[in-house]
Amino acid sequence: MIAISHADAYQVLLLQAADDGRGPQLFGESLARAREVAQPFMVGETFPSVYLEHPLLGDPFLDVTILYGKLEPGIRIDSPMAPACGEMLEWHVRANSETENVCCGFELDTKDPSLPVAAVHCQPRTHIELVEPFCEAVGEPERAALYLSMSERMPEEWSLSFFGMFRGRPGSPLRVCGYLPKDEVEACIEPTHLAERFREIGFSAYDDAMLGQVASLMAVAPGTVDFQLDVMGDGTLGPTFAIDAQFEIAQPEAVCAAFTDGPAARVMGLLEKYGAADERWHLVPEASFARCIPAEAPDGKVGRYSFTLMPQWVKARWTNGVMQPAKNYFLAKAGMLETKE
């Protein structure tokens, strides 16, 4: 009977996703880098939430986002992509002991061999009081003011929930994000309503064509929609706007139907029509899977260990009103389901 580490599970998830020739088509040569550089980030008693991000148009590559829920004190990550992150991890331990449903983590860019320092991510949700201590913990205290100022001027229906940044890059934007209520998504199907929201928040890098594309995608979005904006160092908004359309597929066995003639297929088909995706999106259900194998738990008990990879959302993005290549996001999960003596 084998014991499976988080690093082992991560390798299984990536290799299975890339099997049957899908690796070169979906992830390109960065797959090998993603397999290697993410291993030091597989920390904690529980397997983290791992998101695999790949484009649906253009040269294939794979980026990896790793988000942590509960972490144990004293955990460190030994990676040049996450220098001096100990204070951030200790902050996260304290925040989770005091507040529920808070997560933070890293986004690993493996597209190029140079491997830049990972971006950091924080999801305070409604706990706005956590923004300043997080930014201080990652050595970017001035970013907190940008988030808090932006949060104050957002309409209630466009409230902020999470943000990300590159440390040590003074000119890089702060990415702020939030979830749109269902009623607001339905309202944004009307381009004039969407344009009014953009004017309220101070976003001007759009045209009528972009409004129509955003509205049409919201009309076919299967479930939750979140938005993303870039806040520049002077507090103004950058030229990029994005939405994530959640697939909300409940079970692995439902993936194929969703991508054949269901809600996911309608979203992907629209992205292909707009020139933001090509036929590779049809490989997404083929890469999805769920498996269980016998394994030994850390306490020596025997049980079933599960591996699951499912598509979670697709990102549509516009810069200066021009639609960019869309990206698909898989959620990779692993862990013991049950044990017995």
What do the predicted segments below correspond to?
Residues 9, 26, 33, 129-133, ...:
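Exposed alpha-helical structural elements
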Residues 68-96, 126-142, 184-206, 254-276, ...:
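Extended intrinsically disordered, low-complexity coil regions enriched in Ser, Thr, Gly, Ala
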